[in-house]
């Protein structure tokens, strides 16, 4: 069976990538940690590209052999293929409609996968994005809203149906908030190889970090590890 990726890939790279991974979570909403250095100088937009992990670091986390498929300075948009707009935040990272009217100023995103030899077969994929806000308080406010949004979309079934392709259904799990990082996991229904995805989101200073990782044999917290490694670089700047 052709494995499908997060729905974010539908509109990117002229539909060169397969959409899918609608991640949704549950649990009790909890506020972001606002005890951090909110007066810290904001990370500049010019520094965003350097925050994304390089392929070597991402491959070390997943135990994979991925390469960068593309980079983007635009939000992704899965609103035309995802079954429930109110839970579009769970369709994948950096969704245009999810971040609309939240005050963000810039985004940098990147897709990595290992499908270069056969575009129909992917063992692993990662989408990572960093989104800048004018202030740390605005970034934390988005994180708090995301905790509530992911909770409202928890433990449910969602469908992604891109034009001309079979629909893909995802069974979603509960959400977890550990150390200021929000995470969830989901499994593709009917997958012959146990294809599943993880999501993670956190905020550091004025930056929101939004990550998705997919694979048949994902390490336990791959998406969280990617997000936290990005966050660590922001903290030390």
Language model features with spans:
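N-terminal export and membrane-targeting signals
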Residues: 1-13
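C-terminal motif of bacterial Sec signal peptides marking the signal peptidase cleavage site
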Residues: 17-20
